[in-house]
Regions:
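Short, polar/acidic, helix-capping and beta-turn segments at strand->helix junctions
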Residues: 1-138
Length: 138
């Protein structure tokens, strides 16, 4: 029997951080048809503070990857708070990963793998891996 995403979260002992409040005039989530669009998320820690730093200057690529994973946990917390039920999510369709990095940093796909690997672990290989863009923001 296939495990539900909520069961996988418990099995791999993940803790979701608090869902952040909107920092401007936007909806954290919008449902259109059978698609759920989620506004940009940051890497919120369990204590509610943000992970900060620029990859290639303050953070290594590996630390950036951990921050991208934390963005995934923050996104799941936002879904749970506003949508109530993570198990209603059927698949990841598209990921736009934006890496706060130096101009010289080029390992954006490696960093965003932190997010993608988490989604795969929660939703499974078939449904947790979608289309993806990984870009750097300086």
């Amino acid at each position: 029997m296939k495990q539900l995403p909520s069961q996988r979260i418990k099995k791999i002992e993940l803790e979701l951080p608090p869902a952040p409040k909107p920092a401007g005039l936007y909806n954290p989530m919008v449902i259109s048809g059978n698609l759920l669009y989620i506004s940009g998320q940051g890497p919120v820690k369990l204590d509610g503070s943000q992970m900060i730093g620029k990859v290639g200057k303050d953070l290594s690529a590996e630390e950036g990857k951990l921050a991208a994973r934390q963005v995934g946990l923050t996104m799941l917390a936002t879904i749970k708070e506003h949508f109530k039920d993570i198990d209603r999510i059927k698949r990841v369709v598209k990921v736009l990963g934006m890496v706060n990095c130096t101009m010289e940093f080029k390992e954006h796909p490696f960093v965003i793998n932190g997010f993608s690997e988490l989604m795969r672990d929660i939703f499974g290989e078939q449904y947790g891996v979608g289309a993806r863009s990984a870009v750097g923001n300086i």
